[in-house]
Design a protein with these regions (language model features):
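Non-globular targeting/processing and membrane-anchoring segments
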Residues: 1-62, 67-73, 167-173
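Generic preference for well-ordered alpha-helical elements
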Residues: 6, 10, 66, 91, ...
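Chalcogenol-based redox active-site neighborhoods
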Residues: 52-53, 69, 94, 124-125, ...
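Thiol-based oxidoreductase modules, predominantly thioredoxin-like and allied folds used
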Residues: 61-65, 83-87, 92-95, 99-120
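Eukaryotic basic, amphipathic alpha-helical target segments in cytosolic regions
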Residues: 77, 102-109, 129, 149, ...
């Protein structure tokens, strides 16, 4: 057991030393090429982030019309849509968590939908309990989190609990 562990550690160290040797032996052109590639990737990432923010990612906006809902979701890969009602304590709890997550997960669009002002949509998505969080991927409903059951049934669940649930259902990456 101990010898095997020592051998494993030695192998890891050997491979790290070899990688360092390769770096030292690399010419200036190769290092410059790596630097250029990394810079290009960083610029592409910044541009993508800018595009996502421009299309409302990172914000948690309220939708009050069905037409607006469809416009918001039709071109977006991942959407987390909270169907709620103003001045309802459990909906306000969900709003707090989703507003935090929206800023952390730009790959997903987070919206709040006023259920009472979008009756056709709420009916079509079979919204019977508020809050309900509808997870949409490529214009299809993947899952609906109804009430607080999946978060443990209590009002004091953490943002992390909801985040892990959204990750489990592939609503965030």
């Amino acid at each position: 057991g101990v010898m095997k562990a020592v051998q494993t550690v030695e192998n890891v160290l050997d491979s790290k030393l070899k990688a360092l040797d390769e770096l030292e032996n690399m010419g200036d052109e190769e290092l410059e090429a790596i630097r250029e590639r990394r810079l290009k990737q960083a610029k592409e990432h910044a541009h993508r982030t800018e595009q996502l923010r421009a299309s409302g990612h990172g914000d948690y906006r309220t939708v009050t019309e069905e037409r607006e809902f469809f416009a918001q979701v039709k071109t977006i890969v991942r959407v987390v849509a909270h169907f709620g009602r103003s001045a309802t304590s459990r909906c306000e709890i969900v709003d707090g968590h989703l507003a935090k997550l929206a800023g952390q997960h730009l790959e997903t669009k987070f919206i709040r939908v006023e259920a009472e002002r979008t009756p056709y949509l709420a009916d079509r998505l079979k919204i019977r309990v508020l809050p309900s969080i509808v997870l949409i991927k490529n214009n299809k409903t993947e899952h609906t989190i109804v009430g607080f059951e999946e978060m443990g049934g209590e009002d004091d669940f953490s943002t992390l609990v909801l985040e892990e649930l959204l990750f489990k259902y592939n609503a965030i990456t």
